[in-house]
Amino acid sequence: MPPGELIYGFGLQLLSFSQRGKKKTIRVNADPKVDTGDSHAPVPFYVTTRGYGLLVDSARQVDFYCGDARLKPTHSAKAASGAVNTPDMTRKLALQDPGEITIEVPRAKGVDVYLFAGPSMREAVQRYNLFSGGGLVPPEWGLGFWYRAEQHGDTEAITKLATEFRERKIPCDVIGLEPGWQTHAYSCSFAWDSNRFPNPKGFVSNMGKQGFQVNLWEHAFTHPSSPLFDSLLPYSGNYGVWGGLVPDFAGEKARNVFGDYHGRTLVDIGISGFKLDECDSSDFTGGWSFPDFSRYPSGVDGEQLHAVFGLRYQEAVWQEYKKRSRATYSLVRSSGALATPYPFVLYSDLYGHRDFVRALVNSGFAGLLWCPEVRDAKNSEDLVRRLETVVFSPLAMVNAWYIKNPPWKQIDRVKNNAGELENDWQTLEARCREIIGWRMQLVPYLLSAFESYAANGMPPFRALILDHPEDSALAEVDDQYMIGDRMLVAPLFAGESERKITFPEGKWCDFWTGKVVRDKTISAPATTERIPVFVRSGSIVPLAQIGPHAGSSESTTLTVRVYGDGSLSWQGGGVAGIGLTLTWDEKNQKGSVRQNSQRARYTVAGWEQLGAEA
């Protein structure tokens, strides 16, 4: 490694961004506390600013020494200066000196290593994504707004919540049910609690009539009371978790048994997706998961199964949707290498806002999707800033599993569950409704970004440095990111007086006002009303009309924004049902629409130009 070459990647890293000078251990673990490489979704893949990527294909724990493993000195020398060095100073020296990447797989007899050529860093990532099978295009409803209800909710409570959302004009596509839908959780029965949900099929059908998809929480550890238990027993490990079986998802038979049950009993009554929880490990969270020395019928041990458990769990469920030619967009708490095609989005029980944004930025290096979910907040500012971030992410969700009322009605958890609402909760609700509305407007643009993900491997959400590896000013920017080919997002964080925003080369316009940005860096004060979002000057951006859900008739009507001279046309393909190419004639101040697919469902109602310069 020459001086100045930088390293990025290793999957869902929440605690660091640029990795040169560090040691990373690729090991699946929930809620990492320190920057070791442990993660919900670690990936033994990295890219460098020299324009290549490298994948170590192993289910064993892999150690990467990113320029910090150095041979001993062989000659005596005098002190270079009288300065007192610190660990941070020595890491900076590691960036300035030549180095090497050393990879150790202690418990493997051999591994396959794949080298992905660029010539640019972004092209190396694209090649990795295409090698993995290419990205996914979510269903429209998956890119709408999600809300997970309180865990004890029953048919009456969930129906009341859904009705309230429609009556108060809060857009929502997906309602998530947490552990209480089952007869037993921790471990799971995967059977409906008939007291809370006496008619599951009717409940799901009624939700669908209102435009809601239903998503179910679960984890894979299977309780003895489960209808699945006896058939899964021969295909499980020799150790249990929470009194339940550990399915051997490394083997096809376990995946088929587990998946078939889900298909017949849940997918076939209309369940649109699942939240696959607790499928990582637990060295930092109580040690509840299966041990590394456990054994499985497929021949793997616990260490290997931890590495692939989340991936193969996804596969077991996803195959049931593929059999039925149905799309899903689901949640999972662990994933890994080559997951690019999987229609699952990661989440965490951690809750640092900055860590969540950093995870979103890092996810684009490794073919992963990440949801910086909103659960609760310190105050109204924190709620607003977190909600602003999540609507500019792969999956926009409020996870209210432990509060009975939406957080905008009462932020305090105890008071919320006691029914003590804020006196003026409607004001905060209105602000949150507006922010959720932004998400609904963005759905066509997001769909086109995901189409590029599927077609050419372009990560829909990614770090600025990935597009501009030559720009040293972007090397450490882990709190801004690109969406698609023309949008830059810089989240705000509660309690901070201002934030610095750094721009890549080119001319940029404020997304909200069209104002042209002329500086390399600017500061946004905490009083900024809206999350800072910018687009490349010349961009055309379609915005959908806000409807009750992404599949509503209103949502297929577009207003097209033109920034600057409109020289960057926009295209939405037929895969996502958009099927339009939008262009702008600056001379005649006129937009044009060309339909490029018979599947086109969207129509253009009007155009507006922002940021035009005389």
Model regions and ranges:
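Accessory, solvent-exposed terminal regions and/or long lumenal/extracellular loops of proteins
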Residues: 535-614
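Catalytic-domain carbohydrate-binding cleft regions of carbohydrate-active enzymes
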Residues: 1-530
